[in-house]
Amino acid sequence: MCIRDSIYTLPLMPRVFRFLLGGDSRLLAGIATMFEDQGFRVVGAHDVAPQILIPEGPVGRYQPSKTEGDDIALGLAFLRATGPFDVGQAVVLARRRVLAVEAAEGTDNMLARLAELRDAGRIRAVGGILVKAPTPGQDRRMDMPTIGPRTVEGAARAGLAGIAVAAGSTVVAEPDVTRAVADRERLFVVGVRDEAPER
């Protein structure tokens, strides 16, 4: 059985190696295509359980101000502009200034890095907003932006005022706990409309 599986998968390896050279989005989309080529239908978790997606509007008790709304719009525009480079799904802004961009480290580590910079006095801007959304053309079946209680805790440690995510395109893990942590930390969590095209 093991030998037969190895012989079967061996011809697929050049494709897998090509996918690895293109970043996360290309890798995940390529894997989905390989399964589809074998007759499988690939669906996202949100296709099976749409209730895991954040709707438009506030998740907890707090809402962004008008100035914070402007930063949210700028963050979404930034993510759309950097999407073709497969940089990441998140950016942190404060008063129209980019403070951090998610890369290979992921959202939690980006927030930890931001907290360290703030503790070291490298960031003087008060507050800030984590904006998270899928990048244009991203295969959302395989890589949907996600937040949860740990994200909110990381945002609080980084001194942020809140989190804005693409409504209907972001998974919220443990929504009740996420809401409770956001309210406890006095952070807003809000689903906002995003115009990034879906693949």
Regions from the PLM with identified roles:
Residues I31-D47, Q51-D108, A112:
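Internal active-site segments that recognize and position negatively charged phosphoryl groups
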Residues Y8-V42, D47:
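Ser/Thr/Gly-rich flexible loops in soluble cytosolic domains mediating phosphotransfer, phosphorylation
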Residues L21-S25, A29, S65-A73, F85, ...:
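Electropositive phosphate-/nucleotide-binding environments in soluble metabolic enzymes
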Residues D37-F40, D86-Q89, A94-R97, I123-G128, ...:
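Short coil/turn connectors at secondary-structure junctions
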Residues V91, R95-V152:
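Glycine- and Gly-Pro-enriched alpha-helical subdomains that act as flexible
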Residues M1-I3:
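Conserved small/polar residues in nucleotide/adenosyl-binding loops
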Residues E153-P197:
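C-terminal binding/interaction regions
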Residues L21, D47-V48, A104, A133-T135, ...:
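Short, ordered loop/turn segments at secondary-structure junctions
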